[in-house]
Amino acid sequence: MPELPEVETSRRGIEPYLVGATILHAVVRNGRLRWPVSEEIYRLSDQPVLSVQRRAKYLLLELPEGWIIIHLGMSGSLRILPEELPPEKHDHVDLVMSNGKVLRYTDPRRFGAWLWTKELEGHNVLAHLGPEPLSDDFNGEYLHQKCAKKKTAIKPWLMDNKLVVGVGNIYASESLFAAGIHPDRLASSLSLAECELLARVIKAVLLRSIEQGGTTLKDFLQSDGKPGYFAQELQVYGRKGEPCRVCGTPIVATKHAQRATFYCRQCQK
């Protein structure tokens, strides 16, 4: 599933082609996504794009009459293409732009979303989200306070959007490795110093992934059709049985609630 770096990479890739241009119309080939494509999107006409923003894993297209909320789901990607390029099997939504380009949404598993809202504030998919991990609001003191009474393992807690947004399975595993913290540690057992280190590491890992265009493991593509290159720098995720790049110990993989966790027994305590 695309996580924060992949969504931010998409935002940065599409923004120059959308802001200042006008959506002439939308083409919805298959509106049966995770939630049905909002009726307002079918009727879009002559709408200038004012901004392209991101909140958590949601892309937000600001128009004069409201907002398009896009979620990439499990396998979605957005590409900027020439308008004349014919769609392929899993190309479900196009925004046809005044500059001769089309924003094309591809989603083989159809678990993404295209929603419309007049006002962002209070929308149900955005209403209960925690702070952005790259913001000043997310820091060691905040993390320690939120972990203090939490009787759950630190990894699933990091992936809870009420704590912090956008830190999914890949980046939770990578950040915990970089901080030397075992993923099964109780959140409440982390010291303030460990929380400060973990908060710094999460920011660094996410920023590095954004620099590399995100992580492509299967479906994700950048807006220019290229894969994300952070997969080449993964330390533990997807490396079961391979030697740890630090100590040589084989990487361990476990599964809880259908999610795989990767870690090094030697480096993470």
Curated annotation (Swiss-Prot):
Give the range the annotation lists for the signal sequence.
none
Enzyme Commission no: 3.2.2.23, 4.2.99.18
Listed A to Z, the keywords are: DNA damage, DNA repair, DNA-binding, Glycosidase, Hydrolase, Lyase, Metal-binding, Multifunctional enzyme, Zinc, Zinc-finger
| Entry annotation: catalytic residues | 2 (schiff-base intermediate with dna), 3 (proton donor), 57 (proton donor), 259 (proton donor)
Which InterPro entries has this protein been placed in?
DNA_glyclase/AP_lyase_DNA-bd (IPR015886), DNA_glyclase_Znf_dom_DNA_BS (IPR015887), Formamido-pyr_DNA_Glyclase (IPR020629), FPG_cat (IPR012319), MutM-like_N-ter (IPR035937), Ribosomal_uS13-like_H2TH (IPR010979), Znf_DNA_glyclase/AP_lyase (IPR000214), Znf_FPG/IleRS (IPR010663)
- What domain of life does the UniProt record list for this protein's source? Bacteria
> What is the reaction catalyzed?
Hydrolysis of DNA containing ring-opened 7-methylguanine residues, releasing 2,6-diamino-4-hydroxy-5-(N-methyl)formamidopyrimidine; 2'-deoxyribonucleotide-(2'-deoxyribose 5'-phosphate)-2'-deoxyribonucleotide-DNA = a 3'-end 2'-deoxyribonucleotide-(2,3-dehydro-2,3-deoxyribose 5'-phosphate)-DNA + a 5'-end 5'-phospho-2'-deoxyribonucleoside-DNA + H(+)
Q: Where are the zinc fingers (FPG-type)?
A: 235-269
Q: What residues bind DNA, as annotated?
A: 90, 109, 150
The yes or no answer to whether the keyword Membrane is present is no
Molecular function terms, GO-annotated: 8-oxo-7,8-dihydroguanine DNA N-glycosylase activity; class I DNA-(apurinic or apyrimidinic site) endonuclease activity; damaged DNA binding; zinc ion binding
A Gene Ontology biological process in which this protein takes part is: base-excision repair
Q: Which cofactor does it need?
A: Zn(2+)
Q: Does the keyword Plastid apply?
A: no
The entry's free-text remark on the cofactor is: Binds 1 zinc ion per subunit.
The role this protein plays is: Involved in base excision repair of DNA damaged by oxidation or by mutagenic agents. Acts as a DNA glycosylase that recognizes and removes damaged bases. Has a preference for oxidized purines, such as 7,8-dihydro-8-oxoguanine (8-oxoG). Has AP (apurinic/apyrimidinic) lyase activity and introduces nicks in the DNA strand. Cleaves the DNA backbone by beta-delta elimination to generate a single-strand break at the site of the removed base with both 3'- and 5'-phosphates.
Subunit structure, as described in the record? Monomer.
| Family to which the UniProt record says this protein belongs | Belongs to the FPG family.
Which named protein is this? Formamidopyrimidine-DNA glycosylase
Q: What is the lineage of its organism?
A: Bacteria, Pseudomonadati, Pseudomonadota, Gammaproteobacteria, Enterobacterales
